[in-house]
Amino acid sequence: MATELDKIFLILEIAEFIIGMLGNVFIGLVNCSEGIKNQKVFSADFILTCLAISTIGQLFVILFDSFLVGLASHLYTTYRLGKPVIMLWHMTNHLTTWLATCLSIFYFFKIAHFPHSLFLWLRWRMNGMIVMLLILSLFLLIFDSLVLEIFIDISLNIIDKSNLTLYLDESKTLYDKLSILKTLLSLTSFIPFSLSLTSLLFFFLSLVRHTRNLKLSSLGSRDSSTEAHRRAMKMVMSFLFLFIVHFFSLQVANWIFFMLWNNKYIKFAMLALNAFPSCHSFILILGNSKLRQTAVRLLWHLRNYTKTPNALPL
């Protein structure tokens, strides 16, 4: 029987699911229609579309996971059900995070400017570098999946206290192994965060340098390049903020689930954890001029449609 807390948790999770679906479906439809119309797919649109598709898959996994935790939490600790759900969530989360990181790096090389030869060399080979990052993310996904599988197997043994002999004799050893595996998982999650943070820092340096050059040339501090810098910085900063909340919520959720299994507290951690796939799409829409203009036109048409009287004149 669902409690009041379970009902509130499910309502909030459904709201996050709807919000995330609206934003990501919109991004996917706009980019696909533009690609069909222009008979050409740009790199940024391709990454955005892949990110939207990956996030949509993650949102469905999150919704199923939420109903499982909210209505049948006792089934979560079973090997046959808990393990595949956690593995599937981890795969979609890994892809979403790395695609968002690649998008941040792409915008950095597209907008920022440094006269250094290394930057110009990387910028010239930007598409190939993005492909290499995605290949690296796939290798890390395989490594993470193997580590996570061992992590889940040990954790479910600890949670299953019916095996008292194993629990009393080997619990300390198992917890030590869990700590090592958890550190490995955290390190691989830190790689995309550090790449995005580096992009943001260089964005800031590029903006400062560009603004100083404009002031020295008496052109003011507002031009198209400056505005592009600022929009991209806001987008990357918003992504990093959500990613930090997402990362720490994931660590807290893992600790609560595998160490305490407190059904009440893990719901709050999941709500914070799932804010990233739900809200990130709207940051992308606001930061992309094409998506932003399309969204404004759509809202304008919807507003006019709602104002149209339904009654037909006699």
Curated annotation (Swiss-Prot):
Taxonomic lineage: Eukaryota, Metazoa, Chordata, Craniata, Vertebrata
PANTHER family in alphabetical order: TASTE RECEPTOR TYPE 2 (PTHR11394), TASTE RECEPTOR TYPE 2 MEMBER 42 (PTHR11394:SF70)
One Gene Ontology CC term in the entry: plasma membrane
Per the record, ranges on the Extracellular side are 1-7, 72-101, 149-187, 260-265
Similarity remark: Belongs to the G-protein coupled receptor T2R family.
Any GO molecular function? G protein-coupled receptor activity
Q: Which ranges of this chain reside in the Cytoplasmic compartment per its record?
A: 29-50, 123-127, 209-238, 287-314
Q: Which UniProt keywords apply?
A: G-protein coupled receptor, Glycoprotein, Membrane, Receptor, Sensory transduction, Taste, Transducer, Transmembrane, Transmembrane helix
Q: Which gene encodes it?
A: TAS2R42
Q: Which InterPro entries match?
A: TAS2R
Q: Which organism is it from?
A: Pan paniscus
UniProt key word Transport: no
Other comment: Most taste cells may be activated by a limited number of bitter compounds; individual taste cells can discriminate among bitter stimuli.
Ranges annotated as spanning the membrane: 8-28, 51-71, 102-122, 128-148, 188-208, 239-259, 266-286
Q: What does the record give as the function of this protein? A: Receptor that may play a role in the perception of bitterness and is gustducin-linked. May play a role in sensing the chemical composition of the gastrointestinal content. The activity of this receptor may stimulate alpha gustducin, mediate PLC-beta-2 activation and lead to the gating of TRPM5.
Its main localization is: membrane
Its recorded name reads: Taste receptor type 2 member 42
Q: Does the keyword Lipid biosynthesis apply?
A: no
**CDD domains (alphabetical):** 7tm_TAS2R42
**How is the protein disposed in the membrane?**
Multi-pass membrane protein
* Residue positions with a glycan: N163
Q: What does the UniProt entry say about where the protein is found?
A: Membrane
Q: Which Pfam families match?
A: TAS2R
